[in-house]
Swiss-Prot record:
The gene is Bcl2l1. A motif (BH2) lies at residues 180-195. InterPro entries: Apop_reg_BclX, Bcl-2-like_sf, Bcl-2_BH1-3, Bcl-2_fam, Bcl2-like, Bcl2/BclX, Bcl2_BH1_motif_CS, Bcl2_BH2_motif_CS. This is Bcl-2-like protein 1. The chain crosses the membrane at residues 210-226. Potent inhibitor of cell death. Inhibits activation of caspases. Appears to regulate cell death by blocking the voltage-dependent anion channel (VDAC) by binding to it and preventing the release of the caspase activator, CYC1, from the mitochondrial membrane. Also acts as a regulator of G2 checkpoint and progression to cytokinesis during mitosis. Isoform Bcl-X(L) also regulates presynaptic plasticity, including neurotransmitter release and recovery, number of axonal mitochondria as well as size and number of synaptic vesicle clusters. During synaptic stimulation, increases ATP availability from mitochondria through regulation of mitochondrial membrane ATP synthase F(1)F(0) activity and regulates endocytic vesicle retrieval in hippocampal neurons through association with DMN1L and stimulation of its GTPase activity in synaptic vesicles.
């Protein structure tokens, strides 16, 4: 599922950049085409020294890319729901998360004072704090939203080179640290069941449903994410 996870990261970051008037294609070729969408490139192994502070890039061979046959049993259940549905659910959940924390979210990445030389350390510290007490779907949404905001902040500050790096860091963390939990909790199918089909928009119309499952995870994730950021110098 590693390549599919990377596809989710690229799609989400592309979406967030487009909301600010930027195009993913402006930045996907910045560092040797390392962050192109997976359906356009063959899996590559990242050179550890190529990115400041970036851990080795692990791309497992996956028959799941682009609907290829020969799926392993661990992937079958998750592929029942099309990748497009997962992407859409992530976009909607990310928008809802940012809407709820718009005021704080507008400044959160600027608190890090990132530079190309310190960006990975900042990313790692914030993400480790976010998941320090465990993983849930709300925190996974916060993880994606943080990465998107960090990319936008990088471009705004003319550090476009960081966009491809952030995409790689996110995909690596997702594969190495979050994928086991995702598999154990129903896969992305479960995420789509909870957050898909415009659930974020519908939840604003029906507060009882919203408070029951969405707000709990999102609020905790928001508090953890914002707290970890604003507690930093």
């Amino acid at each position: 599922m590693s390549q599919s996870n990377r596809e989710l990261v690229v799609d989400f970051l592309s979406y967030k950049l487009s909301q600010k008037g930027y195009s993913w294609s402006q930045f996907s070729d910045v560092e040797e085409n390392r962050t192109e969408a997976p359906e356009e490139t063959e899996p590559e192994r990242e050179t550890p020294s190529a990115i400041n502070g970036n851990p080795s890039w692990h791309l497992a061979d996956s028959p799941a890319v682009n609907g290829a046959t020969g799926h392993s049993s661990s992937l079958d259940a998750r592929e029942v729901i099309p990748m497009a549905a997962v992407k859409q659910a992530l976009r909607e959940a990310g928008d809802e998360f940012e809407l709820r924390y718009r005021r704080a979210f507008s400044d959160l990445t600027s608190q890090l004072h990132i530079t190309p030389g310190t960006a990975y350390q900042s990313f790692e510290q914030v993400v480790n704090e976010l998941f320090r007490d465990g993983v849930n779907w709300g925190r996974i949404v916060a993880f994606f939203s943080f990465g998107g905001a960090l990319c936008v902040e990088s471009v705004d500050k003319e550090m476009q080179v960081l966009v491809s790096r952030i995409a790689s860091w996110m995909a690596t963390y997702l594969n190495d640290h979050l994928e086991p939990w995702i598999q154990e909790n129903g896969g992305w199918d479960t995420f789509v069941d909870l957050y898909g089909n415009n659930a974020a928009a519908e939840s604003r119309k029906g507060q009882e449903r919203f408070n029951r499952w969405f707000l709990t995870g999102m609020t905790v994730a928001g508090v953890v994410l914002l707290g970890s950021l604003f507690s930093r110098k």
